[in-house]
Amino acid sequence: MTLTLLPAVDVADGRAVRLVQGEAGSETSYGDPREAALTWQRDGAEWIHLVDLDAAFGRGSNRELIAEVVRAVDVAVELSGGIRDDASLDAALATGAARVNIGTAALEDPDWVRRAIDRVGDRIAVGLDVRGTTLSARGWTRDGGELFDVLARLDADGCARYVVTDVRRDGTLTGPNVELLRSVTAATSRPVVASGGVATLDDLTAIAVVPGVEGAIIGKALYAGAFTLPEALAVAGNIGNIGNGCAGAVGR
């Protein structure tokens, strides 16, 4: 079994950037998003996590550039940022992205999200951006309800997958919140993609052995050179040999 790794390409004002704890204004620029995505593809990525931060913060969009990035690569793309109604959902899917993440709308417009899940099925994942057990909305600028109440509702609505981000650790290189991941996977049978805080190769192992976690988004660690994507993929590919079968649920 392997842990699916999704190197991140976050786009703001036409540039690939990384934020610290999701704070607008904390961006560090890493250049052309297309080149970033192609670099991860050349390094062996099978998925890329692509985010339109301007759309997420409600300050515009990079729609044409995002579509160019998706077209430029030959790997699967998970697309996130500002998907809150039929028009933005259809536009996101029209880029050719394999999967889209819905965040704020899952908290503010549950009826629409229920209909979207009915219509699109497992091409939708819901992003659960968490501080403690409180969800964050509108680009992490507003509180959005209690994690486990929302999780139960989304499970009942048929959500196929969750992307769980500890906002306090995102972009900080302080390690993942494994206890948060364990609490979420204990509350749902749906697969979880972990996000936030990965700093070392050992962090990937710690994530992978949580039953129910199928993938991990990696951002700052790759851009800062903490390790390379080929190194991370080698670790992820060896997860099944770790422990006494404790990673048996990974990648389901």
Curated annotation (Swiss-Prot):
It is an enzyme of class 5 (isomerase). Its EC number is 5.3.1.16. InterPro entries: Aldolase_TIM (IPR013785), His_biosynth (IPR006062), HisA/PriA_Actinobacteria (IPR010188), Isoase_HisA-like (IPR044524), Isoase_HisA-like_bact (IPR023016), RibuloseP-bd_barrel (IPR011060). GO terms for cellular component: cytoplasm. It is found in: Cytoplasm. It holds the Pfam family His_biosynth. Keywords: Amino-acid biosynthesis, Cytoplasm, Histidine biosynthesis, Isomerase. Gene3D superfamilies: Aldolase class I. One of its GO terms (molecular function) is phosphoribosylanthranilate isomerase activity. Belongs to the HisA/HisF family. This is 1-(5-phosphoribosyl)-5-[(5-phosphoribosylamino)methylideneamino] imidazole-4-carboxamide isomerase.
